[in-house]
Amino acid sequence: MALTAAELEAIRRGLGRGPTPVELALFTAHWSEHCAYKSTRGRLSRLPSKAPWVVKGPGTDAPLVEVAPGLYVTFKIESHNHPSAVDPYNGAATGVGGIIRDILTVGAKPIALLVNLHFGPPQDAHAKWIAQGVVRGISDYGNRVGVPVVGGETWFDEDFTYTPIVLATCVGVVSAEDVPRGGVEAGDLFIVVGSGADKSGLGGSAFASKTLTEEEDLGAVQVADPLMGKRLIDLVQEARQCVKYIKDLGGGGLATAAAELAHWFGLGLEIDLDKIHMSDAEMGPAEVLISETQERLVLVTSEGQLPCLKALFEKYDVPYSVVGRFTEGGRLVFKWRGEVVGDVPVELAANAPVLEWPTRPYKAKPLPDLPQPPLDKAIDAVLSSPNVAKKAAIYERFDFDVGVRTVVKPGEGDAAVLKLLELGDVGIVVKGDANPRYTYLSPRLGAANAFVKAYRNVVVARGIPLAAVDSINLGSPARPEVYWQFVEAVEGLAEAAEALGVPIVGGKVSLYNEYLDKPIKPVVAVVVLGKIDDVGKAAKATWEAGDGIYLWGVTKAEVGGSEYLYRIFGEVAGEPPAVDYAVEKEILRLVGTWRPRKATDVGLGGLAAALAKMAVNSGVGADVDICKAPAETTRLDFLLFSESNGRFITAGEEGPGVKIGEAEGEKLRLRCGGTLLYKRKVEELRELMALRL
């Protein structure tokens, strides 16, 4: 039971009686935090979501962003944290399947996946078991349905050893004429298609709305079926002309799908639960109602279009059931073998109470006095950190070329670049970022950092940012410090979106991410999507022998929350880097003017990590004088490792900013004037920076 005494009383008042078992199942599922956003939806309206190019914003299964007249891109982010903690393979695989189906709801063809993953330290046996299972689940599902995994990020921290944060983003494309037209009316049919209902994932939404304990709840984890998922993708590409609306049958099962659709269209809905095709004949009506069996969609169509759909169901060998009909009157009615087993007002079901929790601010540990360590050892330690390391051990498990759209592949640049085959050379640029240490130290500034980092990655790759989606992952909102984190994170996201002119068109909040009474560091992930007019001119994080190396932006004494501070001193302290939105917008202008083909931003791990990444990517060394970098600090370790925002590197004959070095030879040399600070062969760097799982 996920309902409180106050909620049960509200249900009794709304019904004028006690709920039946089926009605109780409905409210338990649909009023869960996972489905109803009880603790968060009142605050999320603060996020700006409108722009002339936003056709459809938050509130339904997937948004729509116009990238050219008559052509839309959709993208959405989803978390599958609790399931991945207890069954990493299926938890991650079903997370990917669910986000793909969200994209299908607007009739789009899924063209790419990105994953933002947060695990415990890779040397920990349990964390490694989770990481390996999650990566395998994502790989198997994405490869089998033919949707490439083109990018993302992976973060390692002790907080995620038993409570991983597993985020998947799917991108799709659809022409305006292929978006289901809506206009649902009384008499229209409610059809369930896909896998047969079973008990896998039963109570999954309630499970995701409570804190994890040592007692694993494997029964609440759904089981993936990528072959059925692929059939649904193919079905939708033809069926979109025969339907009025498509909805994913995911969290909350039929309970949530029925309540949301009836509410959105201002209608009632009558469903015969026993008519749903099942793979478990022992299920009762309440179980059928809240089953979260994967690979299922709801299609809404008129009686006259049913023959069109039936032919497609047969063509793609997709099971289906016509189980309900929309009605006048505003009631949700559920039947089982002819008997009414549930009858509730739509508005009661659709409007869970809004919760507002108390908040309690905290102050993070101030930055201690830091002695300067031996720089060569410090550089090696930061570059070999699993957070800075090259993630080939993960992305090489993924098929990132399927679909022939991927232009800039994982590891090659700051963001994924995909060709829109429908528009010739026009494409999209997409990147997701998060830094849990930043959002722990300052939730507001940390959230803003995630936004500007993703924004800058897209810009440096030559994209023009259009829209963003976010994912906020926290502990229990009943903890005043955690709810304060949420409130502050929303403010940080709102400030960044408003200042940069990039609307937030969707998102996800996941709460109760705790283990044994310990909440995680907050994870606020932001995925920014941009447009590029010619994918052949996208920038990659590389250089060639003879290139000048140019740095634009000012390095400040900003090592609060940095990888350097944690790896060398074991500290999580200080303030995250400041954000200057005018500087970030100036980078957009500069990139548009200079049009670099070889570039990277400076972020995690500082200038040392950015230079090492470009050397490893290109196989060419460099000679760099870090003391030529524009800076507000003279400490050499801060010049190397500060994570100040508003900086990027370009390589070529000329570039914006200050020339700090030249690409040459087979070694990376970092110096200050005539003093050599660090020297390593590129092949040694490649080995040093290789993540091992």
Swiss-Prot record:
Keyword ATP-binding attributed: yes
Binding site for ATP: 37, 76, 470, 507
InterPro entries the record matches: PRibForGlyAmidine_synth_PurL, PurL_linker, PurM-like_C_dom, PurM-like_C_sf, PurM-like_N, PurM-like_N_sf
UniProt keyword list: ATP-binding, Cytoplasm, Ligase, Magnesium, Metal-binding, Nucleotide-binding, Purine biosynthesis
Catalytic activity, EC: 6.3.5.3
Active site: 34, 80
Domain of life: Archaea
Compartments where located: Cytoplasm
A GO molecular-function annotation: phosphoribosylformylglycinamidine synthase activity
Pathway(s) this gene product operates in, as recorded in its UniProt entry: Purine metabolism; IMP biosynthesis via de novo pathway; 5-amino-1-(5-phospho-D-ribosyl)imidazole from N(2)-formyl-N(1)-(5-phospho-D-ribosyl)glycinamide: step 1/2
Primary localization class, coarse: cytoplasm
Ligand binding (substrate): 79-82, 101, 222, 292-294, 510
Catalytic activity of the protein: N(2)-formyl-N(1)-(5-phospho-beta-D-ribosyl)glycinamide + L-glutamine + ATP + H2O = 2-formamido-N(1)-(5-O-phospho-beta-D-ribosyl)acetamidine + L-glutamate + ADP + phosphate + H(+)
Any one of the GO CC terms: cytoplasm
GO biological process: 'de novo' IMP biosynthetic process
Binding-site residues, Mg(2+) 2: 102, 248
Cross-referenced Pfam families: AIRS, AIRS_C, FGAR-AT_linker
Catalytic class of the enzyme: ligase
PANTHER family linked: PHOSPHORIBOSYLFORMYLGLYCINAMIDINE SYNTHASE SUBUNIT PURL (PTHR43555:SF1)
HAMAP family assigned: PurL_2 (MF_00420)
Record note on quaternary structure: Monomer. Part of the FGAM synthase complex composed of 1 PurL, 1 PurQ and 2 PurS subunits.
Role played: Part of the phosphoribosylformylglycinamidine synthase complex involved in the purines biosynthetic pathway. Catalyzes the ATP-dependent conversion of formylglycinamide ribonucleotide (FGAR) and glutamine to yield formylglycinamidine ribonucleotide (FGAM) and glutamate. The FGAM synthase complex is composed of three subunits. PurQ produces an ammonia molecule by converting glutamine to glutamate. PurL transfers the ammonia molecule to FGAR to form FGAM in an ATP-dependent manner.
Family indicated by similarity: Belongs to the FGAMS family.
Protein name: Phosphoribosylformylglycinamidine synthase subunit PurL
Organism classification: Archaea, Thermoproteota, Thermoprotei, Thermoproteales, Thermoproteaceae
Gene: purL
